[in-house]
Swiss-Prot record:
It catalyses: crotonobetainyl-CoA + (R)-carnitine = crotonobetaine + (R)-carnitinyl-CoA; 4-(trimethylamino)butanoyl-CoA + (R)-carnitine = (R)-carnitinyl-CoA + 4-(trimethylamino)butanoate. Homodimer. It is an enzyme of class 2 (transferase). HAMAP family: CaiB. It is found in: Cytoplasm. GO terms for biological process: carnitine metabolic process. CoA binds at residues 97, 104. InterPro entries: CoA-transferase_III (IPR050509), CoA-Trfase_CaiB (IPR023452), CoA-Trfase_fam_III (IPR003673), CoA-Trfase_III_dom3_sf (IPR044855), CoA-Trfase_III_dom_1_sf (IPR023606). The gene is caiB. Pfam families: CoA_transf_3. One of its GO terms (molecular function) is L-carnitine CoA-transferase activity. This is L-carnitine CoA-transferase. Its EC number is 2.8.3.21. Keywords: Cytoplasm, Transferase.
Amino acid sequence: MDHLPMPKFGPLAGLRVVFSGIEIAGPFAGQMFAEWGAEVIWIENVAWADTIRVQPNYPQLSRRNLHALSLNIFKDEGREAFLKLMETTDIFIEASKGPAFARRGITDEVLWQHNPKLVIAHLSGFGQYGTEEYTNLPAYNTIAQAFSGYLIQNGDVDQPMPAFPYTADYFSGLTATTAALAALHKVRETGKGESIDIAMYEVMLRMGQYFMMDYFNGGEMCPRMTKGKDPYYAGCGLYKCADGYIVMELVGITQITECFKDIGLAHLLGTPEIPEGTQLIHRIECPYGPLVEEKLDAWLAAHTIAEVKERFAELNIACAKVLTVPELESNPQYVARESITQWQTMDGRTCKGPNIMPKFKNNPGQIWRGMPSHGMDTAAILKNIGYSENDIQELVSKGLAKVED
């Protein structure tokens, strides 16, 4: 297979990935593949572009490194072109409502007829099967959080709150990425394709698993946070200093011992409630939990962030200042690792945003292209799979494809 023009880089060089989906979840999987060197083709509707394009800046990050194909994949010759593309595709990712592709005649079996080794990842809110009440419902970030038990655990004691920005979308996209790569590993061993059913609510069910395990095994559900503090453990979570906020984790025998000396609670060490060797203070079960919080709050409020960080570094207590976004660029760790970077958009502007992650030592990722325009690569992609200029123009004239003006 001849690949589309692009530099060769990263651990996934030579891999062809195609995705169909809008907004964040499915495309985030495509973004990861593209930044790790895969050739990634982004399918958009002919009449309506991906709704993410209305955002002024985010799409320049989320759609960089992609090849844009505008094709009606469910109708007539457009469907034929899509199935021909599948013959040269390693991984196909689609994000839709339940078994939307199967309902429109593009089943796993149809795809495997054209490519027996194809990895197919279906990403939806409620999965490819289940009850009629839920399976075909639309879902976005907050829907998946609410249905999974994740949202109810977040927020404050007075009110649950969804985790932003768009946590369920990003977790689900990463799940699609890792699951597709796991399937591809097996396909290369067996020669038999795989279909993956990724339900966003099940992804978030796993993300919310920590506290749920107590309830599922005969215990009580943990209460929500109070002002950003860990609902289980004292000395863990968000705290206010004299000049701003920090997060900290008071974990470890030595850390607790020395911290208690600083905040005036050394007399509690070695008591039945806080015996020698204590590594965590349970906020609820330990009767001194509220007192620990009261003393720690008072001590932190009397010190600046710099003073707290210096002292906690001496005690080996994990902590960090809560950074504002404007502080990120000048932070020395960000600068040293080039965590924020710049690239050129297709119209020649400079765009700034998060760099590629993670950092591969021997086969690093690369930003080689900005977000393509609607239908920008349609002609090149169709030519790549054997279509002539006349074939392409016929698809365009029938409204089944869009090429760049």
